[in-house]
Amino acid sequence: MESIKQKVPQIKICGITQDEEIQWLNEADVSYAGFVLYEKSCRYIPISKSQELFEKLNENIKKVAVAVNPDVTMVKQVMDAGFDILQVHGNLTEEVLAVTEIPVWRAVNLTDANIFEKLVREYRDLSIDEKITALLMDAKEFGSGKTFGWDAYERDEGKEMLRQLRQILEKEQIRFVLAGGLTPDNISRGIDIFSPDIVDVSSGVEKELGQGTGKDREKIQKFVRNMHSIV
């Protein structure tokens, strides 16, 4: 675990909807840009619009399609558009895994520590599909601006469950992504508790927290600056 803590987590900015936000991501030199393809989200944009935006991204920034219960048709559209990664919330079917030719980030929306404990049990001794390259831990409703109850993972029982999960992920060479309520002000605590490989922020760098009001350049810069100063 010590070797993990020494790594600087990569950054994903999620919920990109505007041209100016692309410029800010390029300036900040983040690793991933997320585009929400879920129509019920306040950050939703169609695949065609996402494509128009991400064509202006720096080449080193990976393009992540954020989907909820995607079907085979949608996955094919995502691949045709040129996305680099498929992030799946909700149901991930065998059919989707079979057809996808890009890496999959499996998102888990946590409501409490019991869900996390169940997750550890499911992943233990499980043969995980090689297309799943990351596990993303998020709050109950992604993009809500709320964390998933970090206090539980600062106690001994929570620390042990987290340790077990990290061991499983490392064995399977699956990256650990921390999402859900991250902000420039709490990123230090999040990294200290979870030692993630990647941090995923959306509402925490918006003009108004959790309102889908568009990103704020200064908050993006502060998030990146604060993260690098504590690792």
Regions found by a protein language model. Name each.
Residues M1-V231:
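Conserved N-terminal beta1-alpha1 strand-loop-helix module at the mouth
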